[in-house]
Swiss-Prot record:
Protein source organism: Shewanella sp. (strain MR-4)
UniProt cross-references to InterPro entries, sorted A to Z: D-iso_2-hydroxyacid_DH_PdxB (IPR050418), D-isomer_2_OHA_DH_cat_dom (IPR006139), D-isomer_DH_CS (IPR029753), D-isomer_DH_NAD-bd (IPR006140), Erythronate-4-P_DHase (IPR020921), Erythronate-4-P_DHase_dimer (IPR024531), NAD(P)-bd_dom_sf (IPR036291), PdxB_dimer_sf (IPR038251)
Any single biological process term in GO: pyridoxine biosynthetic process
The EC number(s) this enzyme carries: 1.1.1.290
Protein name per the record: Erythronate-4-phosphate dehydrogenase
Sites where the protein binds NAD(+): 147, 233, 258
Cellular localisation: Cytoplasm
Catalytic residues of the enzyme: 209, 238, 255 (proton donor)
Complex formation: Homodimer.
Length: 376
C-alpha cells in the first residue's frame, strides 16, 4: 500500500510505517503525477484536494487531512468517487486556545494593562473558540460568544450578536472558518467599517483564517488608530503576508497557533485511527508513546501565581516572543513562511508542565487551564 503524505506531518513513520510504503511530499507543490498510484493520501491545509489533483488516480482508498478545517478539500468530489475522507476536528483546539490566551497575557504585560477584569469576545464558538473560552473562564475572565450558526442549531450556551460583542468586548478573538458566500459569510467579516467601529484600545487576535480580516483595510485603519493592538497568526495571501501589515502587529507568527507537539500528534493519530478502522485492523499505537518528555519535570509554586507569574509559567511552556522574532526576521525571505512552519517543532501545551503546590489557596483554576499535577 502506497501512502503519500505531507512531509511536514509528524509521527507518520511510527504510526503508518507498518501499514505500507510511506512517500513524503511537499504538500504545497503536490502534483497529480505524485499521487497517481497512491492508495492513501494524507495532507494538511496547504494542499488543494480536488479533481485536478486526483482524476488520474483510479485506486485511491482514503484521503485524510490532519486539520480542523476542510475548505481545502472538495468533499463533493470525493463523495462522488466514493473515496472515504476524514479530517481531525479538534486536534489542535487546545493549542489554539492556549496560543490566544498566552497572546492576551503577553499584551497585558507589554502595555501594563491587566487581562484580569477585561471582557473578551470570541467570534466563532467551535472547537478552537471553545478552547479559548475554557482558558479565559478558568482564569475568571468574562467571555462573550458570537456564533449565529451554533445558536441556530440549538447550542445551549448564551450567544450575543456581533454588534453587541463589538460594543462590549475589550478583546476580540477570531475563531471562524472561512466561508465566501451565504448568510454567514466570513470573508472580510472585519472590513474597514467594522474595524473602524472597534472600541478604543481594543485588542484583536486572529488565529483562524487571514481572509476573515480585510488585511488592506487593516493597514489603513492601523495608520489612523494606533490604539488598536493586533496579534496576527494568519494572513491574507499566505504564504506571502503583506509586508506593510507586519510592523502593525504586536505579535506576528506564521499560522502556527495550532502547532503544539500534542496538537500535531493528535491530528496524525486521528487519521491513523480512521485508516485502521477502514482497514478493519486494530489501532494498537498510543498517542502518549509519541511525545518526548518535557524539559521541566515540575515547577514548585510557593504561592498562588498572580498574572505576572502566570505569564512566566506560560512562557516555560511556550514563549510567543521567540516565534514573533523569528517571523519578523524570516517572513520576507524566499519560502520563509513555509520554512518557519516546517521548522516549528518545539512548542508544548500547558499539560506538559506539572505544577507542585501544597498551600492553602484555591488553585483548581490552574488545573482547569490545563496544567498537570496541580496540588499533588
Amino acid at each position: 500500500m502506497k501512502i503519500v503524505v505531507d512531509e511536514n506531518m509528524p509521527y507518520v513513520e511510527p504510526l503508518f510505517g507498518a501499514l505500507g510504503e510511506i512517500i513524503p511530499v511537499n504538500g504545497r507543490t503536490l502534483t497529480p503525477e505524485q499521487v497517481q498510484d497512491a492508495d492513501v493520501l494524507l495532507v494538511r491545509s496547504v494542499t488543494r484536494v480536488n479533481a485536478a489533483l486526483l482524476d488520474a488516480n483510479p485506486k485511491l482508498k482514503f484521503v485524510g487531512s490532519a486539520t480542523i478545517g476542510t475548505d481545502h478539500v472538495d468533499l463533493a468530489y470525493l463523495a462522488r468517487r466514493g473515496i472515504p475522507f476524514s479530517n481531525a476536528p479538534g486536534c489542535n483546539a487546545t493549542a489554539v486556545g492556549e496560543f490566544a490566551f498566552i497572546a492576551m497575557l503577553e499584551l497585558a504585560a507589554r502595555f501594563n494593562s491587566p487581562l484580569k477584569g477585561k471582557v473578551v469576545g470570541i467570534v466563532g464558538a467551535g472547537n478552537t473558540g471553545s478552547a479559548t473560552a475554557k482558558c479565559l473562564e478558568a482564569y475568571g475572565i468574562k467571555v462573550l460568544l458570537n456564533d449565529p450558526i451554533k445558536a441556530a442549531e440549538g447550542d445551549p450556551r448564551h450567544f450575543v450578536s456581533l454588534e453587541t460583542l463589538l460594543h462590549q468586548a475589550d478583546i476580540i478573538s477570531l475563531h471562524v472558518p472561512i466561508t465566501r458566500s451565504g448568510e454567514h459569510k466570513t470573508l472580510h467579516l472585519f472590513d474597514e467599517a467594522r474595524l473602524m467601529s472597534l472600541k478604543p484600545n481594543t485588542w484583536l487576535v486572529n488565529c483562524c483564517r487571514g481572509d476573515v480580516i480585510d488585511n488592506q483595510a487593516l493597514i489603513k485603519v492601523k495608520q489612523q488608530r494606533d490604539d488598536l493592538k493586533l496579534v496576527l497568526d494568519v494572513w491574507e495571501g499566505e504564504p506571502h503576508p503583506m509586508p506593510e501589515l507586519v510592523p502593525f502587529a504586536e505579535f506576528a507568527t506564521p499560522h502556527i497557533a495550532g502547532y503544539s507537539l500534542e496538537g500535531k500528534a493528535r491530528g496524525t493519530f486521528m487519521l491513523y485511527q480512521k485508516l485502521c478502522e477502514l482497514l478493519a485492523i486494530p489501532a494498537n499505537k498510543r498517542l502518549s508513546e509519541l511525545l518526548p518528555p518535557f524539559h521541566f519535570k515540575a515547577v514548585e509554586l510557593e504561592q498562588t501565581p498572580d498574572e505576572k507569574a502566570l505569564l512566566q509559567l506560560a512562557r516555560f511552556v511556550y514563549d510567543l516572543r521567540d516565534d514573533d522574532a523569528v517571523f519578523r526576521n524570516g517572513f520576507a525571505k524566499e519560502n520563509g513562511f513555509d520554512i518557519m512552519r516546517k521548522n516549528h517543532k518545539h512548542r508544548r501545551e500547558f499539560s506538559a508542565l506539572a505544577l507542585a503546590y501544597h498551600g492553602q489557596s484555591e488553585v483548581d483554576w490552574l488545573s482547569n487551564l490545563g496544567f498537570s499535577g496541580v496540588g499533588r
